[in-house]
Amino acid sequence: MSSPGGLHSAHLSSSASRSEAVANAANAAAAAAAAASGSPHWQQQIVKAEISRQSNSPHHHARAAALAARSATSSAIAIQDPSKGIVTPQVAANGLFVAKKDSSAANGGGADDGKGSGADTAPATTNGAAPISSTSAKDKQTWSTIDMGGLALKNIANEVYRYSFLTSLFINHNALTTLSSDIVKLRHLTVLDASGNKLSSVPPELGMLTSLRELFLFDNNLATLPPELGTLHQLEMLGVEGNPLQDNLRSLLQREGTTAVIAYLRDSCPVPLPPPEREWIMIDPDLPDLDADKHANDATQESFNVLSYNILFDRYATAQMYGYTPSWALAWDYRKEFILQEVMSYSADICCLQEVGVEQYEDYFLHHLSQQDYEGVFYPKSRARTMRDDERRRVDGCAIFYKSNKYQLIEKQLVEFNQIALQRPDFKKSEDMYNRVMTKDNIAVIALLENKLSGSRIVVANVHTHWDPAFRDVKLVQVAMLMDEVEKAGARFAKLPPKPSVAEGYPPPPKYTHANQIPTIICGDFNSVPETGVYDFLANGAVPGDHEDFMDHVYGNYTAQGLQHSYKLESSYVPIGELPFTNYTPGYEGAIDYIFYTKNTLSVTGVLGEIDKQYLSKVVGFPNAHFPSDHICIMSEFNVKRSDRGSSSTTAREVHHPTSSSNASSMPRR
């Protein structure tokens, strides 16, 4: 049989086999070792190795599949994985049809916020993007397996590595002495069989193939394994019997199996060089020309910067979720110092953190950041309401830190989405609200800040929406409720009289009559890519009630009339394009964290750039030794646009805020 691109030989030649005496000696030694250790793990090695040795004929796997299919009534021919006897879904390069394997469960969505799976199974793609369907058969890949086994090949053609969609590659029982590092391009491989060759080493790039479930390297000349293979966190079977493997690896495999070997390699892997510092990208402010000329050298021109960072809550950072991360790099004692150092190094005026534990906030971050002139506002998720104090300290939430030498906190507010939903009359008849929104305990935190020198004001909202891509309707509802609360808070803030006095050299403090006249920041982990309804709603100010992200669920006026807000918002990264990702794991990478700002009151003047691409080419995901969370921080700098200033008032104002349905609390002026 021939395959596309001339990958297979047109004729079937017999492969050169190993010496019978060598094979028998290896089998006898392995059997003796297994018997001596009584290890089920090594017994499994022997069984799999024997199956591999019986698969040394040309195109063995493809021929076995064809033979098995002759008696089947279906026209599909399933190539079988000989190691399991289980149908491997695909179509081989030699033209054999096979069933398609679904690996979505392995790759999943962005790891975040509880890391569980939702009860609702509505189709959705990672982090809330609407599912994409293809109606064209020619757009669908019809094969994903290549069987090049038993052909006495000395080299693999480079064209093979162009087929990045491959999920199974059989290059067993050839005469290969090396594997090309280009194999890193086959990121979707779940099965790789390179048994029965002459390999004395395997490339460290194999560690980038994090979807691998089975890696067969039986009967080669391997004395050791590269520690980079420690990132193969989904590997179920590492076949190395028949190799002169060093004693420590062999004994570990005998005693504890594949998982233990991978963990050992992962934790002993040398730490690579850190990446270059992320570039700070300057952006020309969009101030009108006359205004820009007037204030070009004005020392009273106000600017501030905002940092947003999901720091990965300690209780979510488990070895099960982040099996590719060294245990020492996943430990909170290591990560917390790295996070604190990173936040302090950027020295942002306003820092918005998500997934901050109560204990971490009270005992660590507040303590250290207060020494850098920060004060903080923090609320845990709604579940903390009903917990004992010791349990409550193990709940995460959202925190806003601000420079206390620059800003005064006027009001802080907790936004509990499930509690707000209870108070809306139009939601009371919605089963979807009770079944989908009320069961999620996500929150947002709002802080109303006033500049101590100029009297100008800022509304800051820090949010962490639900993570599950199957609940993108819930994310949209949560953000809609957040914008409702931001507008209410802004309206209260606008009613307050201006600051009684300002610093010398500053113009009179601004007077605000409407909420949208106050500079406003909406930032956080939205768990939504730019193509979703959440981003569309924030950036455009409205989405229709029949938007696809509602998924035909009913949410009172939200779906009856559509969503809208009165702010002119834009993501701060729009001038350069959203970052390639803010969440980076083997199963998902994409932009889901944003800093939105009001364009009529603020100009973005700079943003923190992306991570070095060369560094990323050798990294399977975060967290790792250099990045302590599965998210990266984002940061932007803003200029406050000048507005008409009223005359300063000498009358001291009385600070009073009406009670909000979402737990607003006011702070007296100092």
Curated annotation (Swiss-Prot):
Residues engaged in binding Mg(2+): E355
SMART domains cross-referenced by the UniProt entry: LRR_TYP
GO cellular component: CCR4-NOT core complex; Cdc73/Paf1 complex; P-body
Gene3D superfamilies xref list: Endonuclease/exonuclease/phosphatase (3.60.10.10), Ribonuclease Inhibitor (3.80.10.10)
Chief location bin: cytoplasm
InterPro entries on file: CCR4/nocturin_mRNA_transcr (IPR050410), Endo/exonu/phosph_ase_sf (IPR036691), Endo/exonuclease/phosphatase (IPR005135), Leu-rich_rpt (IPR001611), Leu-rich_rpt_typical-subtyp (IPR003591), LRR_dom_sf (IPR032675)
UniProt cofactor(s): Mg(2+)
GO biological process, one term: DNA replication
Top class in the EC scheme: hydrolase
GO molecular function list: 3'-5'-RNA exonuclease activity; metal ion binding; poly(A)-specific ribonuclease activity; RNA binding
PANTHER family documented for this protein: CARBON CATABOLITE REPRESSOR PROTEIN 4, POLY(A)-SPECIFIC RIBONUCLEASE
UniProt family annotation: Belongs to the CCR4/nocturin family.
Descriptive protein name: CCR4-Not complex 3'-5'-exoribonuclease subunit Ccr4
Species in which this protein is naturally found: Mycosarcoma maydis
Encoding gene (name): CCR4
